[in-house]
Amino acid sequence: SHDEPSESSEPCCDSCDCTKSIPPECHCANIRLNSCHSACKSCICTRSMPGKCRCLDTDDFCYKPCESMDKD
């Protein structure tokens, strides 16, 4: 097994919602195939093939958008 995180597992989020509270409570609605990003503590996946997974973590920030990861 290799512990190197793949590029695709870097934490990122394209659809992040935050409450207006202080501190904000943010969660990501992104669906990823087969796994959640590497920083996700609470990940749920459907039983389909491939599994559609989303991270249920609540943070006080949003991760950077995933689309921007391909280009500098």
Swiss-Prot record:
Site residues by UniProt (Reactive bond for trypsin): K20, S21, R47, S48
Lineage: superkingdom: Eukaryota
Keywords, alphabetical: Disulfide bond, Protease inhibitor, Serine protease inhibitor
Outcome reported for the amino acid change (mutating H2D): In 1st isoinhibitor
Disulfide-bond pairs as recorded: C12-C66, C13-C28, C16-C62, C18-C26, C36-C43, C40-C55, C45-C53
GO molecular-function term, one example from the UniProt record: serine-type endopeptidase inhibitor activity
Position of the signal peptide: none
Pfam families to which the protein is assigned, alphabetical: Bowman-Birk_leg (PF00228)
InterPro entries xrefs: Bowman-Birk_prot_inh, Prot_inh_BBI
CC annotations in GO: extracellular region
Protein family per UniProt: Belongs to the Bowman-Birk serine protease inhibitor family.
Any further remark recorded for this protein: Functionally this inhibitor is unusual in that it stoichiometrically inhibits trypsin in a molar ratio of 1:2.
Protein name from the UniProt record: Bowman-Birk type trypsin inhibitor
Species this chain originates from: Vigna radiata var. radiata (Mung bean)
